[in-house]
Amino acid sequence: MNFVPLKSGIFQMGYSLGQGFIEDHEAPPVMKKVLAFEIADTTVTNREFKAFIDATGYTTTAETIGDSYVFHLFVEPEKRAEYGHVSGSPWWLLVPGACWNHPTGPESSIDDVMDHPVVHVSLQDALAYCDWAKVKLPTETQWEYAARGGTTTQFPWG
């Protein structure tokens, strides 16, 4: 895992009312000061997360619960009606058996996407991984600061 340093800075975190989704609780925007920190230059991959699972026998939250939310376009159209969705966010479908190594449900696999970012990882799962990998999970503020790429816009590209 490679880390890159980010300098201290001030940025606007969150969105104005009417932007995004109220359920995300990201409004109103607030100015945040961030001290210098380091962040991984890529997200954790399926391969890296599998190494953690293999080494520890850890069971993820999605595996324990037995389901997780999948973006609707990753589910076969004829199966979409079978699954529950998030009120106000119909693009998320609650799929039984979806978890980190079965990203779109029990028939799916990560075999061909080992270098893709791991998905269906809860905060608890991420903290367990970071403890095992001896790295620090960025805070929400650090993550948003890094994701915005030093801009004041909603997205790094504008």
Model-identified regions with their sequence ranges:
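Mature N-terminal segment immediately following signal peptide/propeptide cleavage
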Residues: 1-13
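Short, flexible active-site-adjacent loop segments at beta-strand->alpha-helix junctions, enriched
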Residues: 10, 17, 43, 64-66, ...
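Acidic/histidine-rich helix-loop elements
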Residues: 12-25
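An exposed tryptophan-centered "aromatic clamp" motif
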Residues: 150-158
